Structures are given as C-alpha cells and as structure tokens.
C-alpha cells in the first residue's frame, strides 16, 4: 500500500466523530513485517501525532500517552509482536484504542473474519501462499464455520485443499487416502506440500491415529489405520508380528474413521486400499489359521470373506455341512459392507445349508407306499428341495460372471456335493419311490387316481366361473417355481392367492399339455407326415388354432401371446379383451431359454416370475381383471452335472417300434414291449399307440444336446402342474374390508429386546427381535440402528439388521448387534437415544432413551494442541 493511501485512511479515521465519553483517538498501527519502518517520514497527518515503538521506548511511550499528553490524537506505529500478552506494556491502552493494519495478512484475516491475535496471525503468515489467491480464500469462507483457533485454521486450510466444506479430521484423512497411497502421485497430498500443510497433516495423523514415523508414508498409514481399527473386533494377538502397525490407545478413533469410510459412497477406493493392506501385511496367510467364529464379526478386510468362504466350502467338500454354522455365519456376514462382492458365494452356501437341513429332516429316505400320499407330500413339502437346488445354481452361475481366483474352484467342489445330494439322494430316492408306487396306476389308467387332472382344467376352473376368467399359461413353469411366484404375489399385491396342483397329461411335453388345458371332451393323437398331432374333439390344438378351439366352446374367448401384449399401449391391450369371458395368455420364457442352453433355464425361471407378476399387474390395472389363473403345460427335470451311462437307456430294445420319442418318453405301437421303460396308458387307450417312460431320472439315448434339461416323463417335477388361483381384492370388496389386516402387506418391524437402558462401556451389545415372521402379508425389511445425542448427532457406529426371518418361533427371530461408541466425552446426566430406522425411510423412526455413563471416556481429540 502506498504511503499516501495510508495517510488518507488514517486522516479519514481521525475525522470520524469520537465515541461517547472519548476525548481523543489513539490508533495502533501494527506492522510486524516492518514494511513501513523506513517510510515513517512520509507520513504527515492532519490531526494526529505519530510515535514509533522501537522495542526500547515502550515505557516512555506509555508515560507520554498516560501522563504527559492526554489530549492529542496519536498513531502508535507498532512493528513488534508479542507471544504473550503480559509482555505487552501497552496492552491496557490498546484495549481502548483502535487497530490499523496495512499488510496482506491483516487484510486476509479481516476479509475472512479471523480473530486477529499473534498465534492466528503467525499461522496465516505460514500459509501466505495459500491465502494469496482469492479462490482459495473463498473456499475457507464457504466452509461450515469460521476457524477460531490455530487447530481449526490448520484443518480449514487442509479441508479447502481437499475440496470439502467440513473441516474435520476424519473428512481430511479420508480424502487424502482416497487420492492414492503414493505421495508423489496423490494430488491432495501434493497440494499440502505446495502450500506448507504437510507437517500439519502428519501432526493430525500422529495425534488421532497414533502413526508416527520420521519418514511418514501414506501406504504405511493405511496399514496402521486399518489394522488398528480391526483390533476393535479382532483380538490383537491374532496380529502378532504386526505390533508396529497397532496403536491400541488410538483404536477407537481408527475404528470410527474406517467405519465412516465403510459406510460412505466410495467403497471401491476403500476396497483397493484394503486389498493393498492385505498384501503388504500378508493378512490372508495369518488369518487363515483362525476359526470362522474368530473372523465372523470383522468386516474391513475383503480377504476375511474369502477365508470364511474357503473354510466353509472345504468343510462341505469334506462332507461336513454344519447347518447352524453356515446359517449363522451368513447372517453375520450379510450385514457387512463387502457382502455384495461375495453375495453369490454366501447365498449359494445358504442353499446348501437348506438342502442339508432338508436331508436331515428326511434322512430315512422316501418310502411312502401310496402314490396319492407321495403326490401330497411333494406338493406340500418335497418341492422345497427343487427350489433350494434352483437357487443354489442361480448363485453358482452368477458367481461365474464375477470370477474370484481364490473361491472359484472351491465353489465347483461344492457343486459336486450338491449334485450328489440332489441328483442321487433326492431325485434318485424320491424318483424311485414315486415310480414304484405309481407304476400300476400309470400302466392301467395313464394317471394316478384321486389326483386332479390337467385334462379336466377347463371343466373344473373355466366352465363353472360366473365372471370373466383370465388364464396365464407359462410354458415349463414347474411347481416349485409357481410356489415362489405365489409367495411373491401374496406379499406384493392385495390379493387372495391359492396354490394347487394337478397331474399333467402324459407325455409331459408342450403339445400335449397345451391341448389338455383347452376345452375338449376327448383328446386324440393323429400321425400325419410322420408327426404326431394332438386333437381336441377332432380339432388341431397347434398354437395357431387354440383361439379357434376356445371360441368353439365360448365365442367370447381369445388366445393371446405375452410377448405381443407387453409391447402394446394400454388402450390397445384393453381392446383385445373387451367383451371377452375367457382370455388365455401364453407365456414362454422358461422353455424358450432351454433351446439356447440348459444352464439358461434357472435364470429364465427368475425372469419368468418377474414377467408373470408384471402380467398380473397389467390384467388388474389395464384389463380390470380380478380373477386370474396361472398354470403351465408341464414341468421339467434339470440336473447340472454331466450324466453317466448309468443315467441313460438305449432305444435298441424298441427300435422300429417308436412313433415318437424324446429323452423322457416314447410313444410306440401297441405291441411294443421295450426293456427298462415303464408302460403308461396313452390318452385313455383310445388310440392305436401306447406310451412308455424311463424310471426316476433316466434319459433315453438320442442324438443332440439337451440332456440336462428334460421333460416328457412321469417324475413329480415334470408332471406336477401348478394352478395358482389369484383373486385381486379391491379396497371396496367385502372380503378385503372384513380381513383388511390379513391382506394388507406391511414390513415386519424390529424392536429392542434388551431390558437395560444404561451403557457403561465404549463397546457393548444389544439384542433385538423381529415382531412377526415374514409371511404372506408381512414382508422382509432392513433396519439401521445407531445411537445419537439429544440433538440427533450420531455418537456410535451404525449396525444393520436384515429382518427376513420366517420362523414362527419368536426365539428364532432375534438379532445380536455389537456397537462401538465414538471417541468423545459423554455426560451421565445427558439423554442419548437408540434409533431404529428402516433403510428405505418409509416408517417412523423408533427412539429409545439411554444413559451413557463411562468413567474414563475419551474426549474428542484436540489436534495440534
């Protein structure tokens, strides 16, 4: 600033009227940099005297101002700074005087409203390069609060260089680590170096994390931080040999920092850092010596998932399938942040546990002597094994899309064990039982008596209906898939849903099953051009003729294709069914997928469930339909593992006698008597042909692929055709009003089970319980649980509860959560709250009052002091 500008400023200030009770004005001109010490002769003031402090004339100046001259205005030029206020002999005069500064530091401090004292001024000078740019000063002004102490100013500068508004140690540390572990390549750390903030950064790290090295390194800091944090849930002795990276006194802060990162939005960066730490510390080799229980609650390292999964998979391969260990471990791990990276492996093992539990329940095997009873047991219980197998293979196939070199081969060994349990024990045992008890009736009648028949579908469900009926026929939707669909419809829609079954016609292939679902008095078969055609009362039942067959019985009928409907506008859809009493909608996702590859079938089942739910919504919303039937033409058998020669039967014994055959059925001339096949009466014996089927899961040898996914035979999986009766309940319906609580689907709720409301440790646990079992009208929900102070500020980490338990036994619906309080001071007279909130934010939060009484609680770190 030019001296004439200074003179102008000072004269202007002396011209201002004096405050009340003041007789003169004294202005202290601070110039610690002595920029104007040699220019004082140029200062000529209109109505004030100038006196300069030299360091040796302080007493004389004080005497002059206090005794000798009590009326003159003065400018006291002060080029001296004092570390301690008591060293300033003129302090009492300064306190009632005005201050004036001409240096850039003063201007910056004034601009930012930073308290002007020696310690703050010294620090602003230290960061002169930083404050020299308006854009960087603007970042300080944009922060949540004005720095009032040197520590806050250090953090404000670092926060500005990080590009964040919260000048908090956690935020700064995490942003630096997110920039990479190589100091030379980390842009944030290099900006610290450029603007002289690196020493402050390492001082903050030293006090907060306990990491102190002569040559500090970001990679070593990451190792120290994550390992120290892990000792909160992992016993320190498990990390023997890594003591130099551990600081137990700083454990709470390191855990809090890592926990905050774990629950942030940039998990991939933490994943990379955690993998780096694992490699540098050789963690997999150390931790693989521990038990699953030792590791189950530690989440910061991804390798822990690989170790846990490896141990469980190895045990399964060794024929050790501990259902409780697997289910409890998966329950603990699924709330951890890296679960999504390993979801397919965990969920696959959970299905193995379900299969093993089923095996234990039926360890005596399958020996029911009555075919009708076997059918009933399959429809009510046994089908669950098919679902577990399907869900396992869904997880397995998805795991192949995200390869993990440490787990892939082990998971494939698990597949081998699953195949043994499912294919040989379940399909083999149940298949033999069923084949044995149904053989006579199948030979004599072509069906099992006293079981509803697919060929009666139209007469049983459509003809008696007193309102419009819409039928969805999903090709190859077997019973267990329909059971999953029915469960989801109950939970997701306001409806009454019943699941029933009927025995599919033989052979269980599309052209026969689709024909059986059409109206008819008699089904016959006609051989034409070496192709067996199925006729309903003499009419073709091919897909192009089904609309005609339906209209022949009721002109107000129509046959539609799902794939056509889905692409139409709402008005176009509605026009198709306007005035119709009977609507058949054909859906083909599962069977169509089998034509691509056998392994596409189970993913197609998942898609089919979603598509069928969508079709139900379209019928309700666009068609105004309330009564919907969902069924299939047939089911299917599927096994993943390659079949052996023992799983096949040669057709040489009936060569030249076959009219048509597939891998699971054969239609032959009446006089045929093939070996190794069961006779099945064909179409009530009203044709010149007879039928045969392999026992259990045996396939007939033939050229081409498609050995693993098959249908056409008499197994329960192929012949148990589902019938879902779906009745949509409108709000005004009598049934809904009478049973509103039954039909309204609500999320299950979670409440605190522990009785104590006092916390006396930084680490503690609480028990919670799920009030209702997940059922038809109670859906699973995920809850987040944490502690806050009376102002809502979190004072603990956050735990997750996945409330999806289906057991009717309340003792099975409990959850045990471990909490860690933040490193701060707690008051035993203040009120704290446990908060239970659903993850979607759709329910009102639950709050429980707590007292926190910790004798030696750690106060918040006062960095740099």
Language-model segments: residues:
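Ligand-binding pocket scaffold of soluble enzyme catalytic domains
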Residues: 475
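…; additionally, a secondary subgroup of soluble metalloenzymes is captured
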Residues: 1-468, 478-628, 632-865
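Beta1/beta-strand and adjacent pyrophosphate-binding region of the FAD-binding site
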Residues: 472
